């Protein structure tokens, strides 16, 4: 496969195909275009619709409006710091459209995706094609970033490269409610442990209320439609009813944990708490944190309204379940995110087995950078596993292929420190400092090899 040809002394650059206009595809297209490479960005919506997308915008957030922690001493904060150092488009757009969320970075999802779409449309080197790509291009350089809802035709194409057509799991999405429908007398504002401002609304339950809710939830009618086993769900999007079925207290130690939250009206900690997080700039819509579900909609109405404060809740979006596909990256990909047998073919995003918005975007950055270097005939970059992005890519490309499961950013995937540190906070800070030093070296390397014009 060739992406460039010499014609009359000038280099003619063939466009790189980026297949999929989600978070990873948007980042990959941007990185290529910023380095002088023309891009054809393929997005099947609105021609082909999905069960969870609500607009035609690129980089639409479908599960939650939270991009997780902003704190510098967290794995998610470190990931964001690294992404900003190498020029993330999505983080810039997220900062411009953020809404209050304590120490987390949350965005107005509609404004965010609209801004990303406008930035990509305005770039002179990016052509957005609103059609389904049903086959992998046989010539030139391509990046597959088709995401968790890869169309059946494209997934079969990918499977033919050596993937397994049974590699999939399910994501469940949490419901959203209107703020005006909440009972203000029963909820209170606070962020866990007082971190950040009081950006979350909290619905406290006493023991009796919690146990009645738990009983109804575990007996509720769910949407089947598929042969589903608990192992098919990534733990970060485990349906709340499945968590509840593991035991009476699993919710209290999971999404409904009350620790770090004191009700100012009673000066006491509740038995359990549901948190509501702002989802739009106006503060009119709030999401039920950690309440991804596959309950039938009538059951969601009935059971979730048992929670104090939600008795008259207006659900503007019910929780739903959808299939999330990914390839066996340890078998198929190099740490450059190239396919092992087809070096001009790159992969990025959740289809590689990373889990999370920022994780997907980060792989899009790396795939875009390496695709640009491939076009220019430069050496491709393998990020150090001492960095969070490098550790994430190292994990998905070197894990045991027989039991490969999706992974998100966390300190556990970083190499151990040379010196053992028992204190967790201090240990995490050392991880951050080590990664930042390594990232500075990598950032300089990027600058030395940036392809601006041919």
PLM region descriptions:
Residues 70-117, 121-122:
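A conserved beta-strand/loop capping segment in the N-terminal third of enzymes
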Residues 19, 143-145, 347:
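Redox-cofactor binding/interface segments in oxidoreductases and associated redox assembly factors
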Residues 12-24:
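Beta1/beta-strand and adjacent pyrophosphate-binding region of the FAD-binding site
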Residues 288-354, 361-363, 381-398, 404-408, ...:
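A glycine-rich dinucleotide-binding beta-alpha-beta segment and adjacent secondary-structure elements
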Residues 406-454:
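C-terminal auxiliary extensions adjacent to catalytic cores
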Residues 361-381:
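Internal hydrophobic alpha-helix adjacent to the cofactor/substrate pocket in enzyme cavities
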């Amino acid at each position: 496969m060739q992406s460039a040809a010499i014609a009359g002394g000038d280099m003619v650059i063939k466009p790189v195909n980026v297949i999929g206009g989600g978070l990873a595809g948007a980042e990959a297209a941007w990185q290529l275009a910023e380095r002088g490479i023309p891009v054809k960005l393929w997005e099947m919506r609105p021609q082909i619709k999905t069960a969870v997308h609500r607009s035609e915008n690129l980089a639409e957030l479908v599960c939650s409006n939270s991009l997780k922690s902003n704190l510098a001493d967290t794995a998610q904060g470190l990931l964001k710091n690294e992404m900003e150092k190498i020029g993330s488009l999505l983080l810039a757009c997220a900062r411009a459209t953020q809404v209050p969320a304590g120490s987390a970075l949350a965005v107005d999802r509609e404004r965010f995706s609209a801004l990303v779409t406008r930035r990509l449309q305005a770039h002179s080197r990016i052509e957005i094609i609103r059609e389904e790509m049903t086959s992998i291009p046989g010539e030139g350089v391509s990046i597959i970033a088709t995401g968790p809802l890869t169309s059946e035709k494209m997934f079969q194409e990918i499977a033919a490269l050596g993937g397994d057509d049974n590699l999939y799991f399910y994501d469940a999405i949490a419901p959203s409610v209107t703020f005006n429908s909440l009972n203000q007398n029963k909820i209170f504002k606070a962020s866990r442990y007082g971190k950040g401002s009081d950006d979350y609304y909290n619905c406290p339950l006493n023991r009796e209320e919690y146990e009645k809710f738990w009983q109804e939830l575990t007996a509720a009618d769910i949407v089947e439609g598929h042969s589903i086993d608990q192992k098919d769900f990534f733990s970060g999007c485990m349906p709340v009813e499945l968590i509840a079925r593991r035991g009476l207290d699993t919710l209290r130690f999971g999404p409904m944990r009350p620790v770090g939250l004191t009700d100012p009206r009673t000066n006491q900690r509740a038995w359990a708490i549901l948190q509501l997080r702002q989802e739009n700039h106006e503060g009119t819509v709030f999401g039920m944190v950690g309440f991804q579900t596959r309950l039938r909609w009538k059951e969601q109405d009935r059971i979730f309204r048992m929670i104090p404060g939600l008795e008259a809740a207006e659900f503007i979006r019910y929780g739903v379940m959808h299939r999330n596909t990914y390839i066996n990256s340890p078998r198929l990909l190099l740490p450059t995110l190239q396919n092992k047998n087809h070096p001009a073919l790159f992969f990025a995003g959740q289809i590689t087995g990373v889990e999370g918005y920022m994780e997907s975007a980060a792989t899009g950055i790396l795939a875009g950078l390496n695709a640009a270097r491939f076009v220019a005939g430069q050496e491709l970059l393998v990020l150090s596993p001492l960095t969070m992005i490098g550790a994430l890519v190292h994990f998905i490309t070197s894990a045991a292929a027989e039991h490969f499961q999706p992974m998100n950013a966390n300190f556990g995937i970083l190499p151990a420190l040379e010196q053992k540190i028992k204190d967790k906070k201090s240990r995490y800070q050392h991880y951050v400092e080590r990664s930042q030093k390594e990232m500075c070296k990598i950032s300089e390397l990027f600058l030395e090899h940036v392809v601006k014009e041919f």
